[in-house]
């Protein structure tokens, strides 16, 4: 049986890393607002963030729930740049991304999709969560169509 993957944001990043390390995996991966440039999100910390990292060895950010990010985690992200590490394999990958994503640069999603010949569905006006009226339903319908059809 083929495995189906669904990843959103950081989960999509992890899915792509996994598929890069296991190119023999045959399945379908649908990625919503994929954090394809995860390593750059923490490249330019604010003065307060840099101070916290230097003093405590970590910082707390709030993405709905508090997340503790260690210096090691930030370094690991830099070492796992998908633009360098991703290797297309047997899996069929599709991405969906909002054109107004405030967290993950939409242009980077385009660059990634073009570099690796991945289908990218653009949701015009969509934010990172693709949360405006009708967008969650559009994501579900697009994913279902992708998974159920060859």
Where are these regions (language model features)?
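Gly/Ala-rich beta-loop-alpha elbow adjacent to hydrolase catalytic centers
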Residues: 7-15
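The alpha/beta-hydrolase serine catalytic core
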Residues: 25-111, 115-122, 127-130, 134-140, ...
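Alpha/beta-hydrolase-fold serine-hydrolase catalytic core, especially in secreted/extracellular enzymes
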Residues: 149-150
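Conserved acidic catalytic loop of the alpha/beta-hydrolase fold
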Residues: 1-2
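Active-site signature of alpha/beta-hydrolase-fold catalytic machinery across serine-
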Residues: 17-21
């Amino acid at each position: 049986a083929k495995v189906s993957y669904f990843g959103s944001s950081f989960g999509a990043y992890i899915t792509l890393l996994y598929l890069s390390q296991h190119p023999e995996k045959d399945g379908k991966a649908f990625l919503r607002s994929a954090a394809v440039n995860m390593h750059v999100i923490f490249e330019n910390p604010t003065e307060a963030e840099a101070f916290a990292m230097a003093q405590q060895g970590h910082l707390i950010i709030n993405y709905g729930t508090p997340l503790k990010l260690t210096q090691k985690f930030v370094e690991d992200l830099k070492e796992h740049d998908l633009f360098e590490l991703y290797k297309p394999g047997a899996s069929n990958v599709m991405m969906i991304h909002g054109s107004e994503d405030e967290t993950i640069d939409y242009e980077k999603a385009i660059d990634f999709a073009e570099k690796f010949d991945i289908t990218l569905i653009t949701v015009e006006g969509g934010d990172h969560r693709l949360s405006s009226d009708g967008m969650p339903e559009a994501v579900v319908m697009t994913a279902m169509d992708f998974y159920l059809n060859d």
